[in-house]
């Protein structure tokens, strides 16, 4: 994966959790969010299984010293669901669920 990143070649997105070997292969996760996940201690997609997306979001806010856009939480929700075996879905499919579950951030 490091060779792909350094060469500027994008990682293909995984269709299934079992095929996901690098954070950048997660649907909806690009280099910036992959770096954010690494910053909070997530280095491999499998580490997202059974994680609390809100805790990841809050950890990233603390690590950066800035409030992250709520769509980051939507994206973390999508990634955790995907690694739990769900089909890939766009992050914005989680916006209504996030608002209902967590209210205003």
Question: Where are the language model's segments positioned?
Answer:
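C-terminal extensions
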Residues: 1-27, 31-105
């Amino acid at each position: 994966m490091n060779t792909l990143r350094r060469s500027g070649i994008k990682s293909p997105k995984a269709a299934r959790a079992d095929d996901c070997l690098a954070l950048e292969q997660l649907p909806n996760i690009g280099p910036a969010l992959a770096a954010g996940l690494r910053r909070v201690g997530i280095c491999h997609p499998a580490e997202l299984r059974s994680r609390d997306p809100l805790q990841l979001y809050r950890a990233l806010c603390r690590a950066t010293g800035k409030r992250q856009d709520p769509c980051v939480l939507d994206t973390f929700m999508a990634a955790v669901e995907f690694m739990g075996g769900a089909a890939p879905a766009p992050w914005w499919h989680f916006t209504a669920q996030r608002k209902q579950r967590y209210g205003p951030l």
